[in-house]
């Protein structure tokens, strides 16, 4: 990653789109591993990573992810509830299936058919042109229908979808806390149900040497919730090894919620099936856990070709370099 001055980052952050802006169908521009160099210098990369860090800052010291939210965020909640409703209409296919449940392809087809209408919940007629870009990230947020899998690349698309709404002025910086915590919580609930119902394979998994088979972002924002001094003095990172504490904290903290889901999905000693998370328990304070996870996200998600190759580029997330050469 090239070093970019704060003024350039601020200009990128302050850029906004409206009804007079041009939009286009996002393209697949990362087609081989060598394209990662250009991506790491692109406006899209900086826009995403900067947004992640802003959401992280908004999460610091917030005890409970059930936070108050604006009418803008309420529309996002309604969108996710509509997505969740589709699962009720598509039961898993019966019989034994080697890789995931093929009914997920029907689920995704139903999502595609209703996606534009679902977008109308938050996108006004004046910005309908922007749908062509937002729909790409929205549909990419809920797994891949061909591979029947879900992973960090789909989380990345959801981050892109939310940032796209922000760029259009449909969300506000005042919403960042609710987005990072409550919207992430609702999104996770939707995606966990998909994983369990259709037995979605881990996408781009490192096996046991990955942080988590399917998710990453809840660990960042959840550790941020505990990164203030007051919280760090009450509960330590090794508390995730205590099932009683995990079950209790899962109702308010995204990190512990993610650990609880692992405990549901996996059997055997924690240090065997989740060695990276187990190693993190040796870190003494949550602020260091949080800093380390942000760096890890940059390296293991935003720098990995198998993950980022599925992210597409339009005018909201341009592939051109942030700093002209």
From Swiss-Prot:
The keyword Coiled coil does not apply. Keywords: Cytoplasm, Isomerase, Nucleus, Rotamase. Signal peptide: none annotated. It holds the Pfam family PTPA. It is found in: Cytoplasm; Nucleus. It catalyses: [protein]-peptidylproline (omega=180) = [protein]-peptidylproline (omega=0). The keyword Hydrolase does not apply. It comes from the Eukaryota. GO terms for molecular function: peptidyl-prolyl cis-trans isomerase activity; protein tyrosine phosphatase activator activity. One of its GO terms (cellular component) is protein phosphatase type 2A complex. Gene3D superfamilies: 1.20.120.1150. Its EC number is 5.2.1.8. One of its GO terms (biological process) is mitotic spindle organization. Belongs to the PTPA-type PPIase family. PPIases accelerate the folding of proteins. It catalyzes the cis-trans isomerization of proline imidic peptide bonds in oligopeptides. Acts as a regulatory subunit for PP2A-like phosphatases modulating their activity or substrate specificity, probably by inducing a conformational change in the catalytic subunit, a direct target of the PPIase. Can reactivate inactive phosphatase PP2A-phosphatase methylesterase complexes (PP2Ai) in presence of ATP and Mg(2+) by dissociating the inactive form from the complex. This is Serine/threonine-protein phosphatase 2A activator 1. It comes from Schizosaccharomyces pombe (strain 972 / ATCC 24843) (Fission yeast). The lineage of its organism: Eukaryota, Fungi, Dikarya, Ascomycota, Taphrinomycotina.
């Amino acid at each position: 990653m090239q070093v970019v001055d704060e003024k350039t980052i601020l200009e990128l952050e302050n850029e906004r789109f409206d009804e007079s802006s041009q939009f286009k169908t996002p393209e697949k521009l990362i087609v081989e591993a060598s394209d990662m160099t250009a991506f790491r210098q692109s406006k899209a990369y900086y826009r995403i990573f900067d947004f992640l860090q802003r959401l992280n800052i908004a999460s610091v010291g917030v005890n409970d992810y059930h936070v108050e939210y604006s009418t803008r965020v309420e529309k996002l909640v309604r969108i996710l509830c509509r997505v969740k409703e589709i699962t009720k209409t598509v039961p898993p296919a019966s019989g034994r299936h080697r890789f995931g449940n093929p009914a997920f392809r029907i689920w995704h087809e139903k999502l595609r058919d209703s996606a534009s209408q679902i977008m109308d919940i938050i996108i006004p007629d004046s910005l309908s042109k922007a749908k062509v870009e937002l729909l790409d990230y929205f549909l990419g947020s809920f797994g891949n229908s061909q591979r029947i899998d879900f992973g960090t690349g789909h989380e990345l698309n959801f981050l892109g979808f939310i940032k796209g709404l922000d760029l259009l002025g449909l969300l506000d910086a005042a919403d960042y806390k609710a987005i990072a915590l409550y919207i992430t919580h609702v999104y996770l609930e939707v995606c966990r149900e998909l994983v369990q119902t259709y037995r979605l394979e881990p996408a781009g998994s490192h096996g046991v040497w990955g942080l988590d088979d399917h998710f990453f972002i809840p660990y960042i924002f959840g550790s941020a919730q505990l990164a203030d001094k007051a919280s760090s003095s009450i509960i330590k990172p090794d508390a995730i090894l205590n099932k009683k504490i995990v079950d209790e904290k899962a109702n308010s903290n995204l990190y512990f919620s993610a650990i609880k889901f692992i405990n549901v999905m996996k059997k055997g000693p924690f240090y065997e099936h989740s060695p990276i998370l187990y190693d993190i328990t040796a870190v003494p304070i949550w602020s260091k856990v949080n800093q380390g996870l942000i760096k890890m996200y940059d390296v293991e998600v935003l720098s990995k070709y198998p993950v980022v190759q599925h992210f597409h580029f339009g005018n909201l997330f341009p592939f051109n370099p942030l700093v002209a050469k």
